[in-house]
C-alpha cells in the first residue's frame, strides 16, 4: 500500500498547477490531503473518480479554511470523519479510513502562534489528539498517522534551528509533545531510512526559501510500533511543486 500525504495549501490552486497530471503519474493507493480550503462541492471529485479515486472529504465550516480529505483507489472497510469532538471537527482536521487491519489517519494539526488563543488551541488539540490516538490503538493497533503536524521535531528537521527556538512550530513544548508522541509507541518512518539533514517538506514563500532549501520538516507519516516491520519505504518528494509544502510518501505491506 502506497500512501501519499500532501498539504496542498488550497486544492483548487494545486489543481491549476498540474496536481491531477502528477497524481495520474504517481498513482498512490491512498492520497491524503490537508488544507483543502474548499467545501465538498468545490472539489473536483469527478476527475478524481476518472483517476480511480473515491473521495472522502472533511471540510471546515468556515469557507476557504483548513479541511482534510482522503482519496483512495482501495475500498476502505470504514471511514470516520472527525474525532467526535465539535471543538476540532468544525475545523475539518481529522479523517480516518480502515483497510483490513491497517488504519490510515489524515490530520492537519493547527499552526498556532508563540502565545495567545491560537497557541492555547494548538496545545489543547495536541493533548486531546494524543489521548484519542491512544484509545484508538487499543481497538486498531496498526495505524498510520500522516499529515501536516506543524511541528519540526528536532534541530535536524529545521534550517538554522537556533534562530527558531521561540517560533511557533519549534517551541520547546511542541517538540516535547512529539517526544511523548514517539514515546507512546509511534515511529517517524522517514527517519527509519534517512538520518541526514536538510530534508524538508515546507518552505516559506518569502525570500526564495525553497530555491535555497531554507525549510522545515513538518509533514510526516508516523506509524504505530506494531506496523514498523511492515514499512517498506518512506520518502520526501521535494521536487514536486504545487504548494508551499511537498508530498511525503510511505509504502507498507498489506
Task: Kindly label every feature range from the protein language model.
Residues 1-50, 54, 60, 65-66:
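N-terminal, active-site-proximal structural segment of metallo-dependent hydrolase catalytic domains
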Residues 1-9, 101-113, 146:
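Active-site-proximal beta-strand elements of phosphoester/diester hydrolases
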Residues 6-7, 23-41, 104, 133-155, ...:
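Active-site beta-strand/loop signature of hydrolases that rely on acidic residues for catalysis
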Residues 37, 44-112:
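Structured beta-strand-rich core segments of catalytic domains in phosphoester-bond hydrolases
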Residues 51-54, 127-214, 218:
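Metal-dependent phosphoesterases centered on the DNase I-like endonuclease/exonuclease/phosphatase
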Residues 63-78, 197, 209-229:
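Conserved beta strand-loop-helix elements of the APE1-like EEP
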Residues 73, 97-100, 224-225, 250-254:
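Active-site beta-strand termini and strand-to-loop segments that position acidic
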Residues 84-85, 110-126, 162-166:
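Surface-exposed cleft-lining segments at the edges of enzyme active sites
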Amino acid at each position: 500500500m502506497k500512501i501519499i500525504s500532501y498539504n496542498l495549501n488550497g486544492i483548487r490552486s494545486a489543481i491549476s498547477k498540474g496536481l491531477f497530471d502528477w497524481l495520474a503519474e504517481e498513482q498512490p493507493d491512498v492520497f491524503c490531503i490537508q488544507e483543502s480550503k474548499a467545501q465538498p462541492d468545490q472539489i473536483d471529485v469527478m476527475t478524481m473518480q476518472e483517476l480511480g479515486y473515491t473521495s472522502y472529504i472533511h471540510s471546515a465550516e468556515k469557507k476557504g479554511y483548513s479541511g482534510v480529505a482522503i482519496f483512495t483507489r482501495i475500498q476502505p472497510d470504514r471511514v470516520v470523519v472527525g474525532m467526535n469532538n465539535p471543538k476540532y471537527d468544525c475545523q475539518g482536521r481529522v479523517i480516518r479510513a480502515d483497510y483490513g487491519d491497517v488504519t490510515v489517519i489524515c490530520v492537519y494539526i493547527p499552526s498556532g502562534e508563540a502565545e495567545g488563543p491560537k497557541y492555547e488551541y494548538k496545545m489543547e488539540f495536541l493533548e486531546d489528539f494524543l489521548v484519542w490516538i491512544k484509545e484508538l490503538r487499543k481497538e486498531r493497533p496498526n495505524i498510520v498517522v500522516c499529515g501536516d503536524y506543524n511541528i519540526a521535531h528536532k534541530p535536524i528537521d529545521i534550517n538554522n534551528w537556533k534562530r527558531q527556538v521561540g517560533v511557533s512550530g519549534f517551541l520547546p513544548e511542541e517538540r516535547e509533545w512529539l517526544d511523548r508522541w514517539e514515546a507512546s509507541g509511534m515511529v517517524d518512518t522517514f527517519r527509519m531510512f534517512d538520518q541526514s539533514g536538510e530534508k524538508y517538506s515546507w518552505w516559506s514563500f518569502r525570500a526564495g526559501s525553497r530555491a535555497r532549501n531554507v525549510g522545515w520538516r513538518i509533514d510526516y507519516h508516523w506509524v504505530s510500533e506494531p506496523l514498523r516491520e511492515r514499512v517498506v519505504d518512506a520518502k520526501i518528494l521535494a521536487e514536486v511543486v504545487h504548494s508551499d509544502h511537498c508530498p511525503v510518501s510511505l509504502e507498507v505491506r498489506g
